[in-house]
Amino acid sequence: MTETQSSQDVSTKLERIAKLAKDKPGVSLLTLAHHIDVNWLREAYRRTRKDGARGVDGQSAEQYAAQLDENLQSLLERAKSGRYRAPPVRRMHIPKGDGKETRPIGIPTFEDKVLQRAVAMVIGEVYEQEFYDFSYGFRPGRSAHQALQAIQNASWRMKGGWLVEVDIKKFFDTVDHAHLREILHRRIGDGVLLRLIGKWLNAGVIEGLVLSYPDEGTPQGGVISPLLANIYLHDVLDDWFVRDVQPALARRAVMVRYADDFVVLFETKQDAERFLAVLPKRFGKYGLTLHPDKTRLVPFQRPDRVGDDDDGPGTFDLLGFTHFWAVSRKGHWIVKQQTAKGRFSRALRRLREWCRWHRHDPLKAQYLTLKKKLEGHYAYYGITSNFDRLAAFFYMAKRAWRTALARRSQQRMPWWKMQKLLERFPLPAPRIVHRYGT
């Protein structure tokens, strides 16, 4: 079977799973694992990143691919027979959005990533029929930029209001295993899949030379972790919000969620305060805690609607952007979004460090990497109202490169000389990639 035929075979099976889930809402589906065969695993392998960090066994994607057919056949037999053993994940820490704290992530082995992808493809298709439209994180055909646009559109339609900004404290580390299993059992009754998920939840964590076995959490870094997080929050938050919260409100409210980051915009302050009062109790039932310093009520009325006794409008940060009211070029009130100060500073610090550490590399190699870094920055932060911040980052990037090259030569580098260099190696200028809300 060719690669194209294999992909088509998987697509057909995904359609069958979706239809089954639609036809049997609320039913625990017992027979799903039979869809996973060697072709399915091959498609899962194709969808798995090949340049990611290595797990505890040190095996690279290239090494695994050297005997791909044999490895996939062996993986299938072990997964179906129950002999598969989930290896420990390798824990490492990366900076969080503000750059002041770190976020622990767990790196599975490459083979474990492939199997996690295969299982996620099955159960993800089931839950895609249930997830709400206001959930944007780690879902096919959805993105952070769609979430940003949804915030902008909701604010415009409702003329602002009162916004609840929420931060769940160490969400991925505190997901309660018992509650997650209970939630999964309502829709997934297949023993093979549930057994594999249980093995991943119970897999050890290696940090340094220490092996531990956490009794809660689903490590970030795993392929299946974002899906499990979405399933958990769909039940704990999304479904509760739609079924219980919204019907009890006096006026409208809109939620926008991207994984564990979410905000809720209310038309009235009273509704927002009631929601903020009951949310900790709801989360507490499922082992989740709100960060007291980062969860707050933000007055976010459109400026021309702010009363004399109101504090607004305020600002809030979400998905790396600061959101605030401003006047558009056409003279209308809109919500603009600009790179958050913490994200800007962290990105610039990383770029400066890279320039300093790689200043002795060949100029062309430096240029190609810097070009890629700038293009990546524009690809995410290049939205309509953010051009000034892009331009500032571009200018500071040129300064950082100039400073590093001056250290390399141990001579001053005037701007005219830097301009000559940039004529040879032109860094990409700022550009808007995502246009909306003008």
Where are these regions (language model features)?
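Non-catalytic terminal/accessory segments
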Residues: 1-438
